[in-house]
Amino acid sequence: MKIMFISLGCDKNLVDSEVMLGLLRDRGHMLTNDENEAEVIVINTCSFIHDAREESVETILEMAKLKENGKCRLLIVGGCLAEKYKDEIFKEIPEVDAVLGTTAYDRICQVIDEATEGKRPMAFESIDRLPKGHVRRVITTGGYFSYLKIAEGCDKHCTYCIIPKLRGSYRSVPLEDILTDARELAAAGVKELNIVAQETTMWGKDIYGEKRFPMLLKKLCQVEGIEWIRILYCYPEEITDELIQVMAEEPKICHYLDLPIQHGSDAILKRMGRRTSRKELEEIIGKLRTAMPDIALRTTLITGFPGETEKDHEELMDFVEKMDFDRLGVFTYSPEEGTPAQKMEGQIPEEQKEERRDDLMALQQGISEENSRKMIGRTLQVLVEGRIPEEDVYVGRTYRDAPDVDGYIFLGA
C-alpha cells in the first residue's frame, strides 16, 4: 500500500514518525509524499498547547476529505492528540479508522492490518512503556542532519506542562540503541546529530542510578562520519561542571546550547514549579560562557503566566537584556487541562499576554542584530544543505544555528 505521513509538532515526534516509516518500509509498503496518491494517511499529532491542538484537528479534517475525493482508504491518527483525546477523535471524526498512542507507535503495522480488515483499532500501551528493539528509521530531514532521541517522558512536572501525562515518566533509551542509531545515520550521510528528549541532561539516571549524559556524549563523539553534535532541551539545573568540561573539550560538540529557562522573575519561576532561581540561572550561564566564550545560547520563555504582574514582566525584560541570548523564542501562556496552573488565580487576558510577548521579541530583535554584527569578519565552518537554483545561492548553517528554529547562511555560488 502507498502510505503518507504527516508529522506535526516537535522533533521528538518526528523521530517517532521516522521509526514508524522504517517499520512500514521493512514491511514492504511504499512511501509517498503525495496525498492524492496515498492509500493510507498517518497523522502524528501534537497536543502541547492550544494552537498545536487546533493545527492537529484541522489537519485531520483536511485529510479526511481525501477519503471521498482521493485514493485514501485509511486515515490513522497517532501522537499526543490521540493519547489524550482518543475517544473524542473516534466519536467526532468518523473518517478516522484507527488511533494509536505515544508509546504504541511500534504497533503501526498491526494497526494498518487491522484497519484494512475493517476493524477500528485503538492501540495504546502503558504511558511509561519504552518501545523495545532498534528500528532503522527513514530520514526525513534532508540527509545532512538528523535528530537523535535519547529519552522519552519527563519527571519535572512543571505546573503548566501536560507532557508527563502524554509521554509518561523519564525513560532513557539504552546506550547501544542510541549508538546504533547514530552509526546508521552517519552511514546514510548525516553529518550533524541534534540530541533531543523532553530533557536531555538527565539521560542514564533511570538505568545507572545517576546521570551519565557526559559519558554518552563522549561515546557519540567516537562515531565516524559525524562532524557536529548539538545539544537541545537542557534543563539548567542539570548542567554539571562535567558536562560543561566535555562540551568545551570535545571538538565535535557544537558550542551551542538550548536552555529553556521560561522566566526571569523568581516569583513566577516558583509558581511554574521551576527548580532554579534567577541568580542560579545567571551563575549557570556565566559558567558556560567562561568555559566557552564563543557559545551560542538559545532559550524559550513563557509570558502571561497566571499571576504575572507588570513588575514580573519588567524583571523578565531586564533578565533578557542582561543575559544577551543569541536566540530566543516566546510563547504566550496556554492553560492546559489537568495542570495546576490552569486552576491558578490571576489568569492574564490574551491581549496582555500578546503585548508582553511583543515587548520581549522587540527587545530580542535588537540583541540578535547586535550579536550578528559582532560576527562580521569571523570565519566559520558552514554545513551546506542545499541550493536555491533561481537565486544561484547555497543555503547552510553554522554551529550557531540549530535546524528549523534558527537562521540560515546564504552563500554565493
Task: Give, region by region, the residue ranges found by the protein language model.
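Short glycine-enriched, charge-decorated loop/helix-capping segments at active-site entrances
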Residues: 47-48, 167-168, 207-210, 270-276, ...
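Proteins enriched for Cys/Gly/acidic motifs involved in redox and nucleic-acid/cofactor modification
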Residues: 1-203, 242, 257, 280-290, ...
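Terminal RNA-binding accessory module
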Residues: 343-413
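Conserved SAM/AdoMet-binding glycine-rich loop
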Residues: 75-76, 84, 89, 187-310
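Contiguous mid-protein beta-loop-alpha structural module that forms a pocket-lining wall or clamp
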Residues: 308, 322-325
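Conserved, mostly hydrophobic/aromatic
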Residues: 178, 195, 231, 259, ...
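Short, hinge-like loop/turn segments at secondary-structure boundaries
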Residues: 93-94, 115-118, 211-213, 247-248, ...
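Short flexible coil/turn linkers enriched for glycine and charged/polar residues
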Residues: 140-144, 154-156, 253, 263, ...
